[in-house]
UniProtKB/Swiss-Prot annotation:
Listed SMART domains: PX (SM00312)
Gene label: SNX2
Membrane topology reported for the UniProt record: Peripheral membrane protein
General function of this protein: Involved in several stages of intracellular trafficking. Interacts with membranes containing phosphatidylinositol 3-phosphate (PtdIns(3P)) or phosphatidylinositol 3,5-bisphosphate (PtdIns(3,5)P2). Acts in part as component of the retromer membrane-deforming SNX-BAR subcomplex. The SNX-BAR retromer mediates retrograde transport of cargo proteins from endosomes to the trans-Golgi network (TGN) and is involved in endosome-to-plasma membrane transport for cargo protein recycling.
Domain PX residue range list: 140-269
Keywords: Acetylation, Cell projection, Endosome, Lipid-binding, Membrane, Phosphoprotein, Protein transport, Transport
Annotated GO biological process: early endosome to Golgi transport; intracellular protein transport; lamellipodium morphogenesis; retrograde transport, endosome to Golgi
Name of the featured protein: Sorting nexin-2
Notes concerning its domains: The BAR domain is able to sense membrane curvature upon dimerization. Membrane remodeling seems to implicate insertion of a N-terminal amphipathic helix (AH) in the membrane.
Amino acid sequence: MAAEREPPPLGDGKPTDFEDLEDGEDLFTSTVSTLESSPSSPEPTSLPAEDISANSNGPKPTEVVLDDDREDLFAEATEEVSLDSPEREPILSSEPSPAVTPVTPTTLIAPRIESKSMSAPVIFDRSREEIEEEANGDIFDIEIGVSDPEKVGDGMNAYMAYRVTTKTSLSMFSKSEFSVKRRFSDFLGLHSKLASKYLHVGYIVPPAPEKSIVGMTKVKVGKEDSSSTEFVEKRRAALERYLQRTVKHPTLLQDPDLRQFLESSELPRAVNTQALSGAGILRMVNKAADAVNKMTIKMNESDAWFEEKQQQFENLDQQLRKLHASVEALVCHRKELSANTAAFAKSAAMLGNSEDHTALSRALSQLAEVEEKIDQLHQEQAFADFYMFSELLSDYIRLIAAVKGVFDHRMKCWQKWEDAQITLLKKREAEAKMMVANKPDKIQQAKNEIREEIEEWEAKVQQGERDFEQISKTIRKEVGRFEKERVKDFKTVIIKYLESLVQTQQQLIKYWEAFLPEAKAIA
């Protein structure tokens, strides 16, 4: 049967019909001798013809040149398709490619060969996101901790100093690990510098912890008690979270003031950070003025995205405040429960000591010990409620205030642009009136002056439009990054919080199961 079949000539210009080869069993038995007698082709012959001809930039079926016999197609059928073939180059170079250094080639090539219905822009957009994620991962290779609070000085001149430790592999820093001492006003000074640089152009600057005059006064003049120790620990944890959020921002991380704060052993004294100073009063006045201006500005919002986001953040702010109040009440409830449990344990122990029945006395003593352990569990859970959940809500209430702040700056930018347009219109109207007036002796000089003013205000209008478009673009990007971080933070904290609850309940079960035999032993 194989002898009767003659292979068609390869130069007849017809594409290979693989349906005619289905019954050719002898094709496969002759491949070994064919391979031995034929030199290897410089180009891979294992590419299917339909894959090559599917692309308009690739060679036509008539241009596919096999070595000696078409049986070589099947002889190499077990080899993998080479993605480095020159015949594949037109497919990959038909469109401009973004920078794909961090991404392996298979992530870009494989989908385009196997799934022709997928459009190239989708692949490139997805690769760009992957590149950005990997780049962000490298940028955020930095760990910051705030520890060792230490009281420096005596009386009202005393202050708390904290050790800020940084571990990083970023080349922008001189060392991979370093630590410095910073006081609370240094943190406030850092935030003030960053806010003055980046807030008005649309960047969300994480807010620093708020001052507490009452709490710090207790630390300065009072003795070390539980309330002052708790206040210092709360502030230490808040400062640590503030720095961690700040260095996560790729733009803020590049700022020289932040690097100086983390590296420099000595910092210039931060000024204008006192709550009751003249600068503090001026800040309160400016906030009140901004609130009044916000009510008077009537912005015609043409972008539905900004209108929707502003409403979303308003609702989110209200719900977070309600939840924060509920969690604060829960923390107080657990502390009260802990105190009542401790009182119950003390009463049970006293009753056990006065009991004459041996088994009952022993059971009451064991019950008192269990209640003391449960009291400790309630205290630990109250701390978990506060440091895990309540502080997260408090941080995001302040962060949403910062988000609202960039929206307000966008409104101010629009108002500045709008004022420039109104002034330009008035200047043009004045020029038109001047042209109508019949005063040739004064018109030329005035015309030149008004023309210079018009050109100046035209430049201001163009600059205002560019500034408004730029801040809108920046805010869109910042809000997207903020939403990702918010979801990630809440997921992490909720999981840790639930794990702490589960651990507490499991420990409670162990305590009561261990006490149960003592109760049953009463006879």
